[in-house]
Amino acid sequence: MQINLITGISGSGKSVALRAFEDAGYDCVDNLPVSLLVNLIITLEKEQCERVAVAIDARRGQSIADLPSTLENLRKSHQVRIVFLNADTNTLIQRFSETRRRHPLSTNAKQPQSATLIEAIDKERNLLEPLRAQAHSIDTSNIPAHALRSWIQDLLKDKPIGLTVVFESFGFKKGVPSEANLVFDVRCLPNPHYDKVLRPLTGNDKPVKEFLEKIPEVVNMEADITQFIHRWLPHYIADGRSYLTVAIGCTGGQHRSVYLVNRLSEYFRKQKDFGILQLNFLDRHRELDSIPVAKS
């Protein structure tokens, strides 16, 4: 059975992620107590369920500490994937303010709401840190709900085994993705933004590709990043990791980083050098994916 555990910081988008799993045909359970997880899996096995997504949060406090060992036992006979939703504290405070909902771990109403909320968020981060360390982490601070749904849909296309390498473009204007394991700063490369014709386009467009692929610095940067990843990827695999996020950043996350992420993703998808190792590759464009989808 494929077991997908959805967890993370309250307000980071767990409900959106769970709905994406449900839309993909998974049996879904929300807010399941940790103590009931094993019994749930046994019941679903009897019903011949093949795929399940379970959302668990930290509202039951210290019981979450038992979850890593529970998951380790489940991995002996099932495929287990953990999806961890995260966001920076300021974004979470804003979201709770907009929805006027209380944080599940907010218990002291005598203090100002902002102080109580910050304490609750910090407590939740500490409780969930052991899970985040072994999960596929998604920072939702700068992405809307539709982008998160799209990213989850892409994730579901991959097998929940082996190492998943995520190539993600971003703009430094909005900060470095918190889930990034490797960060490459490509702001030193010539910027298509200063070409009036190329400015409204993106790294996905042919004119921008043709512009960048002719620049020696871009070619050398791509070669150096490729060589670095190619050399060290086997070591990350040997380290037992399930996920590796390679973030490429330029100023706005529109041209240079998008182009290089596409090039890297295309290159590594074609590689056979890693033998029988099972590798999955995903590519994301944080700033482009955040653009609202036009309604038809």
From Swiss-Prot:
SUPFAM superfamilies, sorted: P-loop containing nucleoside triphosphate hydrolases
Molecular function (Gene Ontology), one example: ATP binding
A Pfam family it matches: PapZ_C
Entry keywords, A to Z: ATP-binding, GTP-binding, Nucleotide-binding
Protein's UniProt keywords contain rRNA-binding: no
Binding site for ATP: 8-15
Ligand binding (GTP): 57-60
Function, as annotated: Displays ATPase and GTPase activities.
HAMAP family: RapZ_like (MF_00636)
PANTHER family cross-referenced by the UniProt entry: RNASE ADAPTER PROTEIN RAPZ
Protein family according to the UniProt entry: Belongs to the RapZ-like family.
Protein name per the record: Nucleotide-binding protein Pnec_1620
Species annotation: Polynucleobacter necessarius subsp. necessarius (strain STIR1)
